[in-house]
Amino acid sequence: MILYEYPFNERIRTLLRLEDLFERFTFFVAQEDAREHHVALTTLFEISEVAGRADLKSDLMKELERQRQTLAPFRGNPGIEQNALEAVLGEIEQTLANLAQMQGKTGQHLIDNEWLASIRSRAVIPGGTCKFDLPSYYAWQQWPAEQRRQDIAKWSMPLLPLRDAAMIVLRLARESGQASKVMAMQGSYQQMLSGRTYQLMQVRVPPELRVIPEASANKYMLWVRFTAQDGDVRPRAVDIDVPFQLTLCNL
């Protein structure tokens, strides 16, 4: 099944963007080639931009504290797996402590590093990081892969508490949902929400159908419409019945 996720608010949208960027960063920083480390570094700049939203850190701390207060009363409950509960609570408490230790504006260490700032300003220009534009950056790219990797890890470290917090919130949101099998008649599906608030919608479709879900929602109803993309033309609506799995997640 192919999984598509649709955020219902700006906070979850931001966390999904951070998750995607950190996954890309983790992949490329683990590689050996200097060009792959260039992608890792420019991705780190993107992470800094997204994570630099003024209220993101405080939002994450409030949400983690809310989850901690929700889960803590289950300690000692015989119907709850205590080892799993303690692991989650320990993870939340450690991440809260790490967030509290973050000082200043998120990503400021990248801005204050004049060398990285020069790379960042050139990286937004098409072809702007050629060796004649940034000879010092080109020289760094000739260093051993492990040395480059250590540098990038050092620059990313101040952002890791935000990554950890985002991953916890997204994981708890995803685990809150229950998948149901539904059918989009002639490619279209709608469902009443009865005013209940959700943070995230997941749509899983069989890959062999080669359809693409498009979704929208308000506090009363959600819509899922399936399209197909063929060659160079824009996706078009399909008129076949599409079986899929729908999950609504609510923290």
Curated annotation (Swiss-Prot):
Pfam families: ZapD. GO terms for biological process: division septum assembly; FtsZ-dependent cytokinesis. Keywords: Cell cycle, Cell division, Cytoplasm, Septation. It comes from the Bacteria. The keyword DNA-binding does not apply. It is found in: Cytoplasm. GO terms for cellular component: cell division site; cytoplasm. The keyword Acyltransferase does not apply. Gene3D superfamilies: YacF-like, YacF-like domains. InterPro entries: ZapD, ZapD_C, ZapD_sf. Cell division factor that enhances FtsZ-ring assembly. Directly interacts with FtsZ and promotes bundling of FtsZ protofilaments, with a reduction in FtsZ GTPase activity. Interacts with FtsZ. Belongs to the ZapD family. This is Cell division protein ZapD. It comes from Burkholderia thailandensis (strain ATCC 700388 / DSM 13276 / CCUG 48851 / CIP 106301 / E264).
